[in-house]
Amino acid sequence: MNHCNDQIYCIEPFKKQIQNLRKNNCYKDIDQLLIRFLRDKDIDHFRTGTLLNKSITHPYIKHDIGGRSGYRMYYLAIIAAKCIYLAYIHPKTGSDGSPNTTNEARTEFYKTIAKAIKDRTLYQVTVMGELLDFSTMI
C-alpha cells in the first residue's frame, strides 16, 4: 500500500487555526483526531467526504472528523502525486465552533492552496510525538 504520510502539506491559515485551537482546552483532542485521520492512509481514503469541485484527479473535499462535536476540514487531494493539501479546519461546537464556512471562504481556501503550491510556500505536516508539526517546505 502506498501511504501519503510524507506528502501531507498545509497552508498558513490551517497551521494558525491548529495553533489557536490548541490554546483552548475545549479542543485538546485536535491533534489526536487529525493524526488518526491522516496517519497510514492510502490516497483513496482522502477521496471520502463531500466533493466541492467536480475533479476526480484533484478533488477538493470537505470532511467531518471526530463525529458530531468534532471538526470540519477542507483539503485538496492530488491523486496522481499522492499529495494532500490541508486548507482549513474549524470546530463544529464550542466557543470557536461554527456550523459551516461560506462558499466564498471555501473558494478562497482553494485559491490560497493553488498559490501556495505554485509559490512553494507550504508547510509539511508530520507527527512529532502526540502533536502535528509544521515545518516549512523547501
Where do the PLM segments sit?
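N-terminal "first-domain core" detector
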Residues: 1-36
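A short, surface-exposed loop/turn module that caps and links secondary-structure elements
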Residues: 39-67
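Detector for short helical micro-motifs
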Residues: 34-37, 43, 80
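Sequence-level motif detector for i,i+2 pairs with an aromatic at +2
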Residues: 3-6, 58, 82
